[in-house]
Amino acid sequence: VAGTPIVEQLVNDIAGVVNQPIEEVAFILGDPAFFGQEIVAHLTKFAENLGAKASIYRQLNPLGTGHAIMCAASILEGPTVVAYADTLIRADLSLDPTADAVIWVKEVEQPEAFGVVQLNEENTIVNLVEKPKEFVSDLAVIGIYYFKEIEVLKAALQEVVKQSLQEGEEYQINQGILAMMEQGKVFKAGKVNAWMDCGNPEVTLQTNAAMLQFKKEEGETLVDPSAIMENSTLIPPCFVGKGARISNSTIGPGVSIGEGTIIENCELQNSLIQNQDRKSVV
């Protein structure tokens, strides 16, 4: 979205605000048939550009977030951020030194659709409930977590994944977190200024528009100098990638056009056009 792959945008955002060097980035990918060597090479280079080592792990069976984390069990050591790859944020991810872990949350209008946390007066999380049928809290878990010693979560999840699953059940990170809370580990809540989901096409388009606006306000260059505009109007904010060619078209707002893409005789708003694509008379 907004010219950057979602997972790269997420890691960049985290790296930019945690104020600590990142030594290693572990990517949990699915079946190689869908996440092949080209993707692995791209992610490896991306991590190296951050000055970090890249590690690739596979979750071949979609058995939940807790199971996904345990796919990378061999490197679960020390201070670690866990983040879901369909989430983008704007936040100060400063870490509370008194906390064993931090869960970032955002107020939402429909908390029954999310996992939510309850806090006490000291901003300590005292309960975590997944998709409550009755009102518990409006602070939704956004899918970014910090663990001072992720070995503790690993040990908890090792016990979780020993359990047999009933049909439709999964191993969830929440099970490990609740076990840690029972051990007396202190979880604090972190707040985000903006939380943007990329879990389905509709919300991804909304996220694209929001990220374009953020980048515009932050002064980022959104139109590559090599892009060619012929008899066309660009209504910002829009992203236009390297080598793209736009002719006889009106583009924007909220449009991202990938590298090498050709747009002809089109009117586009709130759209995502991938690299090396071609659109005519839309």
Question: What is each PLM-predicted segment?
Answer:
Residues 4-83, 93:
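Conserved N-terminal catalytic core of the sugar/cofactor nucleotidyltransferase
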Residues 26-27, 82, 101-104, 189:
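Structural beta-sheet core signal
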Residues 32, 61-62, 85-88, 108, ...:
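Short glycine-rich anion-binding loops that position phosphate/pyrophosphate groups of nucleotides
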Residues 52, 76-79, 98-101, 184-185:
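Short coil/turn connectors at secondary-structure junctions
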Residues 88-164:
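Conserved core of the sugar-phosphate nucleotidyltransferase
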Residues 159-282:
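Left-handed beta-helix
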